[in-house]
Amino acid sequence: YKGHGTDRALLGGILGFKTYDDRIRDAFKIADSKKINYEFVATDLGEDFHPNTVKISFVYEDHEEYVIGSSIGGGNMIIVDINGIQVEFDGTHPTLLFRYNEQKGIISEISSILYKNDYNIESINTIKDDLTEIVNLTIELDQNLSIDLVKKLTTNSKFLMAKYVEV
């Protein structure tokens, strides 16, 4: 990962840089100046993951979170896991992530809210655990959501988890 600049690119992403941002080459210096602690540890994540996969852990004072993503070639990547929740999205579009107990009408309800607020859905993906009947729903959008709509969609008590990833 060092010879290809992957470490710099990953740190640049954590700093919020776009892939074309010239500051990526100085990501280590910038992270150090912002007092961001980082460490790269080569680890085998197992055969369930693509060989070019990375787990990024975010350690806070009171909790830890992580994201697992894979480089799939051509400068493209896919996020496959967030805090143990199986997902699938590429990070190029604003994304809604939901986890809920299987029930009819959830996708329709969310789609209707988005339609009524003039948002277009780029893609929808569901991953259902047949044993627990828990669904992980990913909705990629064509534009960022308003703060009010994010709040409306992510505070619904029907969801075990609801998050919004802005691009």
Question: Which positions does each model-derived feature cover?
Answer:
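Glycine-rich loop at the start of a catalytic domain that most often binds anionic cofactors/ligands
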Residues: 1-9
